[in-house]
């Protein structure tokens, strides 16, 4: 019996900023109590390496399971932890505070690798107006 593996990856898509996002431009997420938040980790990983990582790479690396491994983890150990992590469905980048709170849209290229763009940037507007790119909204912070 083969284990089901879930994915958060999407190709050629834009996660648009949530309708109730308070930011009118891209804001850099800040640490909380001197410690990085998931949003600060996601921001640094994607902003510093645009189109290098997939959504799955970012979601796993910034999860508690991914952070617990550390850099010294063997590739086989990392792969096993990743398979276990994705054996259940995981929240995709639509649920990230980047698009819900901080004003960043997430674009994925045809290979599913991601980059972020400020909501007020020309690149974001270009992607948002492109009918060839699948458009999805970041999840709202509040119901209703």
Task: Identify the residue ranges that each predicted region occupies.
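A recognition module on extended beta-rich or small alphabeta surfaces enriched in W/G with H and D/E
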Residues: 129-144
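Amphipathic protein-protein interaction modules
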Residues: 59-124
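Long, contiguous N-terminal structural blocks used for assembly/anchoring
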Residues: 1-58
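Acidic-enriched, low-complexity/disordered segments with a strong bias for Aspartate over Glutamate
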Residues: 19-20, 56-57, 109, 120, ...
């Amino acid at each position: 019996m083969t284990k089901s593996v879930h994915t958060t990856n999407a190709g050629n898509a834009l996660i648009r900023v949530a309708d109730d996002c308070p930011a009118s431009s891209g804001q850099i997420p800040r640490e909380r109590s001197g410690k990085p938040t998931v949003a600060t980790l996601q921001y640094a990983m994607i902003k510093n390496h645009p189109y290098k990582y997939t959504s799955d790479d970012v979601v796993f690396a910034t999860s508690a399971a991914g952070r617990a491994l550390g850099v010294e983890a063997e590739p086989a150990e990392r792969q096993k932890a990743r398979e276990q992590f994705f054996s259940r469905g995981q929240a995709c980048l639509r649920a990230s505070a980047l698009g819900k709170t901080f004003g960043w849209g997430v674009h994925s290229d045809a290979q599913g690798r991601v980059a972020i763009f400020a909501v007020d940037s020309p690149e974001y507007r270009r992607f948002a107006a492109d009918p060839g790119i699948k458009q999805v909204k970041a999840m709202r912070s509040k119901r209703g």
